[in-house]
Amino acid sequence: DEKKRGEIRKQLGIERDEIAICHVGSLTKVKNQSFLIDIFLQLKTINPHYKLFMIGDGPLKSQLQEKIESLKIEDSVTFLGIRKDVHRLIQGFDCMVFPSLFEGLPVALVEAQASDLQVICSDTISSMAKISDDTTFLSLSLSASDWAREIDKKLEGRKRKDNTELIQKKGFSCDTVTKKLEKIYLD
């Protein structure tokens, strides 16, 4: 919904010409946000209109903030903290990046695909997480520059679409996921 997207972008201070990258996760070593910041720095050299939004909190927050300040990109990075409205917020972004060292099946990644975000994640994440063709898996052995070039290439001239039907077809509707989680916890 373009109207909702516009409202969210306005709330977050994202200008019309800016490209909004997001990351959702606890600020911990396993989520690999230090590498994400390296990727983002490379994105800024390709196009100065990139912005990074980090949703989550954790023990590495101050260390990550120091790194961002030392790279002089603090005006382009926003920490949003822990949010209960991630599914709503992600509608305002253009891309979600998950460079995790290891991960199961991140719910935020499924939500991102439902909102038709381009998703770039490490190949350590289960291939079961791929629902749409707009999800790309990259090796962590690639450089931050390689990741940045791939992200920029994927976002160039991209048009958004409605993935609701695709998500439901793949078995990821709210009801289906809730029932699967209940079964896991109750068994």
Predicted regions and their residues:
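A short helix/loop element that forms part of the nucleotide-sugar donor recognition site in Leloir-type
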Residues: 1-14
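A conserved mid-protein helix/loop that constitutes part of the nucleotide-sugar donor-binding site
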Residues: 19, 23-42, 59-65
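Aromatic "clamp/platform" in nucleotide-sugar-dependent glycosyltransferases that forms part
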Residues: 82, 101
